[in-house]
Design a protein with these regions (language model features):
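Conserved glycine-rich cofactor-binding loop
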Residues: 9, 16-18
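Short, small/polar-rich loop/turn modules that mediate ligand/substrate recognition or access, typified
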Residues: 92, 177, 182, 243-245
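Substrate-binding pocket helix/loop in short-chain dehydrogenase/reductase
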Residues: 102-103, 110-115, 213
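Active-site helix of classical SDR
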Residues: 126, 161, 169
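Alpha-helical segment proximal to the catalytic Tyr-Lys
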Residues: 131, 174-178, 241
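Residue(s) in the substrate-gating loop at a strand-loop-helix junction
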Residues: 146
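Short C-terminal tail/terminal secondary-structure segment
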Residues: 233, 244-258
């Protein structure tokens, strides 16, 4: 199926690995120019080279090393996207962090860190992308949240900021429909990739994670980043033109919520 994304400009945060890289890969495969944002320049350049080697040296891939938890980092990312690519059609907000423990164990600093690294990047990137999308007659904003934003399951700080992202998705979708800008959420379940949180836990406690898989994952395995990236590519396309304001769960039936 041709998704009609050829020539579109897509900005993806957290793009050097995992879900972000898989999303960049899926969008590049559909002919998008991809602007890949991440903090670490070395890992980011390696990820960009992987895309170029797969889709050809002529592929337009723009790596931008920046910290989107800061206003300056977001400014740098969006300015680079406009200067290098001329506009923005798709924005994929894909960063998140949550530390701390129980209510009494979680400090104000833990809460601030969760909001600064999850919710505020999505807000700030969207604020700067919307005028350019409006100028182009529309666009798509994808907010990557989590099933733990719909039901408690991870760290408390992570649950809260991911729930906030789901609410943000609905609010933005209602505001921006008049501008032909769709806003869609994606809530992945437990996804395994090298260097990711589940991979680290698997290295530390293989039996415990095997028990978790058998107990909590109906298909008997973790999801793969590509299984989420492909959904994001579809939602970013005109094939999903009537999908806005909802959060699509991609979890292999892991979550218990309707």
């Amino acid at each position: 199926m041709d998704l009609g994304l050829s020539g579109k400009v897509a900005v993806i945060t957290g793009a050097s690995r995992g879900l972000g890289f898989a999303t960049a890969q899926a969008l590049a495969g559909e002919g998008c120019t991809v602007v890949m944002a991440a903090r670490g320049l070395e890992a980011l350049n390696k990820a960009a080279d992987k895309l170029r080697s797969r889709w050809g040296r002529g592929s337009k891939v723009v790596p931008v090393a920046c910290d989107v938890s800061t206003p300056d980092g977001v400014d740098h990312l969006m300015e680079t996207a406009i200067v290098e690519c001329g506009g923005i059609d798709v924005l994929v907000n894909n960063v998140g962090l949550g530390r701390g423990g129980s209510l009494e164990q979680t400090s104000d600093a833990d809460w601030r860190e969760a909001f600064d690294n999850t919710l505020f990047p999505a807000i700030r990137c969207s604020q700067l992308a919307v005028p350019h999308m409006r100028h182009r007659g529309g666009g798509v904003i994808v907010v990557v949240s989590s099933i733990y934003g719909r039901e408690a399951g991870g760290r408390m700080t992570y649950n809260v900021v991911k729930a906030a992202e789901i609410s943000l998705t609905k609010s933005l979708a209602q505001q921006l429909a008049k501008d032909q800008i769709r806003v869609v959420g994606v809530a992945p379940g437990s996804i395994l990739f090298e260097g990711g949180s589940w991979w680290k836990r698997q290295q530390e406690d293989p039996k415990g994670i095997a028990d978790f898989v058998g107990r909590e994952l109906p298909f008997g395995r973790f999801g793969a980043p590509e299984e989420v990236g492909n959904v994001i590519a579809f939602l970013s396309s005109s094939r999903a033109s009537w999908v806005s304001g909802t959060t699509v769960v991609v979890d292999g039936c892991q979550s218990k919520a309707f």
